[in-house]
Amino acid sequence: MEKELRPGRRTSASLLGKISVVVLKTLAALVLIALLAVFVTSVSPIYDFAEPRPFSGPDIFNPYWDGGDSAFCWKRANFHTHTRVKGILNECEHWPDETDAAYRKFGYDIVTFSNHNELTVHPYDPLLQVNVYEHGYNLFKYHKLVFGCSDVNLFDHLVPLFASQKQFQLDLLGKESDFIQMNHPLRTIGTSEDHMRKLGGYRIMELDSGKSKENEYWDWALSAGHYSFGLANDDLHFPDRSSAIAVRCNFLCCPSARYEDIRKTLLGGCYYAMRVPDYGRGDWEVKYERNRTFRRSSGSASTDRQSTSPCRARPTASR
């Protein structure tokens, strides 16, 4: 005959059973809330995308033909820059003034602060203010830089799986801004060749953000008739790491570092994007010196830099 449980053991078993029930109910509630959040944020119009139309016509568009005095116009820039912000959610430990100062040591003329879902005020000069933020807190890392907006749009799809959802975001953000950059499509889960042949409404694609190269994605879009220029940015989170800062940049033929001139240049295409070696590999003095030398000679050829043109030689699209 089986021995009966002692009172103390019966109490422990009963307590464990109750705890298990509470844990299971809590997990079920969390799963239900997560599914509800995904469902609520998945709403978007269903798009009937037009068939891809490759560029055609007798002319080749040259974005450099009206570049002005090319001997003095070039300005080095990084547009995808994270800094410390007020609050507990931070992706960088350094404030905007510290991050800006770090870039200036390498000869950068333009630094814009693109924190997640937040407009960052320029730390010392209102004339250099550029309203830009990185949109997107979704699980698939479908991120965009939104330029020239007056406020932050917090709507997002938690799981932007379909092309219609992605296009809806581009359309929504495009109505509230001057232009949009599509960030690191290679690192965006679910972004396929089919999506790139459908999506439109962005003016710039991030071709290199330090962790990935998106030339294939850019080519898919261009081949389908979606014309855009390309930028290379550090996507900086750690200005104190030699391998993370001043390894991607863009040179703009731009009269000033003010937003109105930056916007005109980026939309007109008179710039080039490039990768830069991590000079010194941790030796900061070597890195500073090589970048200063590199900056002074930016208008001439250099064997230790790898540049990618933001404009392919493609005919203008027929209207």
Where are these regions (language model features)?
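C-terminal functional module detector
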Residues: 1-71, 238-319
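A metal-dependent hydrolase metal-coordination microenvironment
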Residues: 8, 42-185, 190-192, 198-200, ...
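Charge-rich, low-complexity amphipathic helices
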Residues: 125-126, 195, 284-289
